[in-house]
Amino acid sequence: MSAEPNNNQAKADVPEEVVEPKPTTVEEPKSTTVEEPKSTTVEESKSTTVEEPKSTTAEQPKSTIEQDPKPSTTESSPVQIDDSTPIPQITTEEPKPTVAEPSTTESVTAEPTTEQPQEAAVKLESVKEADAEAAAKLEATKDADVEKAASTSQHSVSFDKATKTHDGSPLSKFYSELPAILEAAEYNEMWGIVLDPSETHVQTSIVLEKFLRANAKDVPKAKAQLIEALKWRKTMQPQKLLESTEFDKVKFGNLGYVTSYNTTEGGKEVITWNIYGAVKDVKKTFSDVPEFLKWRAALMELSIKELDLASATEKIPENGPDPYRMIQVHDYLNVSFLRMDPSIRAASKETIQTFSMAYPELLKEKFFVNVPLVMGWVFTAMKIFLSADTIKKFHPLSYGSNLGSEIPNVAEQLPKEYGGKGGELKSGLTVKYSEGEASKTA
């Protein structure tokens, strides 16, 4: 920045005029344009000289100002500098070079120089060329900085879009939350799978993908549900219920089965059967809700064991169909909908709430068979209030024999009462039973 000197004081960054020994008016060629040096130090002395501009590197000059020297008459008396001459202001990003400023108490007198006008013109032209070269370098530096800034900005945007975690997908983000989830739950087993934070662990990815889909890919909601499900498993220990607990045969015998069938496409269809018409004493079966829930959880674990998730070798496609699901069949033959016992409602409500939390996205389709015609309208009316995804999974059937037409890829293997040619349902898998009045753990 230029300092404001006294009227009798020469200003910095203004080239001195070149004069003959005698007071003579020297006119510079009007066609000559001299560009002001970017950073020039003018030293004040008794004999004023114009120094070559020092090499100064600036990153981004705001502007380049050229100034034509005006003809002036120099006398032997002190030179008077026109205060109206504009002083170019140069702003750079680098620290400004220090300019030696004249003392406020000293007046500067320009003395005649012996240089010829042509020599001065050559020197000025040399200064001009040096300035042009410096300007070109500065422009190149500016372009490089702009390109670098653009590259940095693009990288930042890409990083934000990537959600700042792994590859940016909801599943990848869910993986990054898994260590904290396991620590919060103080448990790491889900459906026979020991959860592993490594993204290459196929079985863990299946579990996480199911919890994500149950929450519309909302990671915080899926995280909260997974923590709750892990805590529930830690307390309930459903695998031990399947392996070690003998349930009361009087209460739960013939109430639930699991079957597996090879499909015509080369896969496997797992079906869980709930035969509510087999209940002999409603109050005994449903009045103890915690006991009923344990029995139902053990049957569900048996179904998952048939799915064999722990040995799966392929992940669920991110936006593709889930091959790791089962079919459920609820048979209401001989069940009265008009005289529904409150204990049945309580047990059903608790089961629905618990299973939706602890076993998300394991249901492929659910068939309600042998539903009385008089109650068929209820399921039709439900379609008005249920989501499209839920409606696709629920199928009320008035007759059990119609089930085979709903599952054509395994129809012939189904029991005869369900439209197939297979063996009796009692030949299917079930939980352990005791002959006593209460369930007991072996």
From Swiss-Prot:
GO terms for biological process: Golgi to plasma membrane protein transport; regulation of exocytosis. It is found in: Cytoplasm; Endoplasmic reticulum membrane; Microsome membrane. Gene3D superfamilies: CRAL-TRIO lipid binding domain (3.40.525.10). The keyword Magnesium does not apply. It catalyses: a 1,2-diacyl-sn-glycero-3-phospho-(1D-myo-inositol)(in) = a 1,2-diacyl-sn-glycero-3-phospho-(1D-myo-inositol)(out). Its cofactor is heme b. Residues 25-54 have a biased composition (Basic and acidic residues). Keywords: Cytoplasm, Endoplasmic reticulum, Heme, Iron, Lipid transport, Membrane, Metal-binding, Microsome, Transport. It comes from the Eukaryota. One of its GO terms (cellular component) is cytosol. InterPro entries: CRAL-TRIO_dom, CRAL-TRIO_dom_sf, CRAL/TRIO_N_dom, CRAL/TRIO_N_dom_sf, Sfh5. PROSITE patterns: CRAL_TRIO. It is a peripheral membrane protein. Residues 1-10, 58-92, 101-117 have a biased composition (Polar residues). Residues 1-119, 141-170 are annotated as: Disordered. Residues 251-426 form the CRAL-TRIO domain. Non-classical phosphatidylinositol (PtdIns) transfer protein (PITP), which exhibits PtdIns-binding/transfer activity in the absence of detectable PtdCho-binding/transfer activity. Regulates PtdIns(4,5)P2 homeostasis at the plasma membrane. Heme-binding protein that may play a role in organic oxidant-induced stress responses. This is Phosphatidylinositol transfer protein sfh5. It comes from Botryotinia fuckeliana (strain B05.10) (Noble rot fungus).
